[in-house]
Each structure stands twice: as C-alpha cells, then as structure tokens.
Amino acid sequence: MSGGYPALELSAEDLRLMLAAHVHVGETNMNFQMSTYVHGRTKDNFHIIKLDKTWEKILLSARAIAAIDTASDVFAIGSRPFSQRAVLKFANYTGATAMAGRFTPGAFTNQKQSCFREPRLLVVSDPLSDHQAVMEASSVNVPLIALCNTDSPLTRVDIVIPCNNKSTHSIAVVWWFLAREVRRIRGEDTRLQQWSVLPDLFLYRDPNEEEQNVEDPEDARLEPVIPGADAEAAETWGVEPSMPVGSLGDMGIAAPGYGPVGGTAGGWSNLDADPTETW
C-alpha cells in the first residue's frame, strides 16, 4: 500500500506504539474471513494480527476519507463507552460528524425522523456493537469502514482495519493514526514533522477514577491544622460549659444547672445579669 514510497511505510516508532497498545492482540476465536490478517496464535490461544496489514488498511481508509469533498459527510460511529472519546476526537480533528453513544434506528433510512442523516462514508468502531448502523448503511449503499477484530464478521464491510477493537488503548491508537493520516493526505500537516496531538487525547477516561483523584478545595481548607484536633473537639461536645450562659426564663427555657439571677447590674462585667432595659 505504500507504493514504494518510504514516507508511507510503517516507521519503527509507529510500530512500537502499536505494540505497546496491543493493537496486534486478537481474540481466541477467529472468523474465517479474517484469516488473511492473522499471523498465528500465542500459547494462550490469542490470535496475532499482522500489523503491516493494519497499516496498509489505515492508509487505504485515510485515502477514502480524504476523497470525500465535504468532510462532514463522513460519519464516525462508536456506541461503546470505550470508543466514544476517540470518535469525538477524530471528528474534531478531521471535520467529520461524530455519532457517539446509542445509534438511533432509522437515522439513515427513515426520512420522517428529525435525526435523519445522509452520509457518504461511514466509519464504525466495531461491526458487532454498531450492527444497526452497519445494516442501515448497507441498505442505502453507503461505503463502510470498520475496525475489525479476529472474531468480527465482515459482512457489509467494504474496508477492514484489522486491529484489537476491545482494548481502550488499541482503539485510541488506531483512531489517532487514522486522523493523522487523513490530515496528512489533505495537506493540513506534513510528514516531516511530528503531529502535535498526542494519542493520550483519544484515550478513554473513566469518570469514576477522575472524581476520586480530584480533591475538593473546600474540604482541603476545612482540614485541621493540628493532627488530632478534630478528635479532641468531638470529645468535649457533651461537656457542660464552664461559664453560665445566662438566664433563659424570659424565653420559657430554664438554663440547665443554673437558677434565676437576682443581680441587676449590666455591662460586660456581669454576663449572667438579665437585661434591665428593652431596645
């Protein structure tokens, strides 16, 4: 697929990135149509995907996407939570239309729906989880590009990108490669320089982990400066005050442990005296 051009060949850096993201690790099962993309098996019966085939299909898919005149006519679909962030980032950097989350049935076939769309090219993260979009794209003759694992069916798929579509790192790296090659083919970026966008931006982030890592600044200010100060304060909650709080007879409440005060002197020196004047 590189056509003999060294710039289009798989570099050692990109190969190390694929290996680190486990793009080559498939499933234990294999669809017979995916046998051409499988190199062999591991001792754990996991199939190994040929990364040279993966790179060739990424270049082919990027050329097909770049051939569309209007970038928004390319639809990137990812229904699983692990692929939604990668789909949104791909659409952001290539100008495509992202459909992250649940796909509405009839979005490509029912013209009476408010969400009806007419794409010219479809890119899905998994033909199994996105089967509704795959079926509707086939019904309206829309070309389809799919990230396929070793057990994925290739029915209705026009361009296959063999990769591990179950791993969060693998999904992020493949979508990142696809976005980078589309921008390079369009002339938006050059191959002589590294793309400034890192693959980490395409990686799925667990919202529960982020909430646990973020500390509330209000809670940080309320923490006691002296260790054990909160425990000492809690022990004195049930102790009666050493200073009388004054007579509460006028309010109908008797002060615990103290009788009425007969003194009439006011001022700050006599805190137990009742007020002699009204405001």
UniProtKB/Swiss-Prot annotation:
Coiled coil: none annotated. It comes from the Eukaryota. GO terms for molecular function: structural constituent of ribosome. The lineage of its organism: Eukaryota, Metazoa, Spiralia, Lophotrochozoa, Platyhelminthes. This is Small ribosomal subunit protein uS2. One of its GO terms (cellular component) is cytosolic small ribosomal subunit. Component of the small ribosomal subunit. Mature ribosomes consist of a small (40S) and a large (60S) subunit. The 40S subunit contains about 33 different proteins and 1 molecule of RNA (18S). The 60S subunit contains about 49 different proteins and 3 molecules of RNA (28S, 5.8S and 5S). Interacts with ribosomal protein S21. Required for the assembly and/or stability of the 40S ribosomal subunit. Required for the processing of the 20S rRNA-precursor to mature 18S rRNA in a late step of the maturation of 40S ribosomal subunits. One of its GO terms (biological process) is ribosomal small subunit assembly. Keywords: Cytoplasm, Ribonucleoprotein, Ribosomal protein. HAMAP family: Ribosomal_S2_euk. It is found in: Cytoplasm. InterPro entries: Ribosomal_uS2, Ribosomal_uS2_CS, Ribosomal_uS2_euk, Ribosomal_uS2_euk/arc, Ribosomal_uS2_flav_dom_sf. Belongs to the universal ribosomal protein uS2 family.
